[in-house]
Amino acid sequence: MTGTGTRATFGDDGVLIVVDVQNDFCPGGALAVPRGDEIIPIINSLAARFRNVVLTQDWHPRGHSSFASSHPGKQPFETVTADYGPQVLWPDHCVQSTRGAAIHAALDIPHAALIVRKGMHGAIDSYSTFFENDRKTPTGLIGYLRERGLTRLFLAGLAFDFCVRYSAEDARRQGFDAFIIEDACRGIELDGSVAAAHTSLAALGVPCINAQEFL
């Protein structure tokens, strides 16, 4: 990170990863994160400081196994046991090629070099931008970052306590320096999930920082 007056820019080893800023996760969407759209101006400002930006996109087929509608008698936000472990059931959301799955129109990052789609396998959910929830199926992002020497990862987006959290944790486990820009995130909050995220991130050495530190 280099300073220009009081403003910081990021060089060849830094990358901003913008997680799932999609219509269905913003107000009015099928799985809206409270005040999720408030982070978009912050992320746009952050992105202008980075040469390298990656977007992620939840991209589910119809009838995905994480949808409550795929489990007769079950309701959204109940938990079931999948082959890979506990799975929260969600409202149908981010269905491929629908408006809800689209990146929010207010997100203005024309130099974003890559969109990583996740959750495309019908029987496996994906919170992390690096692996599906079976912990075996990679998205390809690890190789992309390593090939380009991108070692410092700054994460922002939706939702803090799920996809942002698990992405940051996997980044750290893979040997990257990971930071969450917390005021550029919003959480869902299910049964203490925000507090659990903070505890887990701290244990792995993932700092939660503030966008104003370098805007």
Where are these regions (language model features)?
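Short glycine-enriched, charge-decorated loop/helix-capping segments at active-site entrances
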Residues: G29-G36, T129-N133
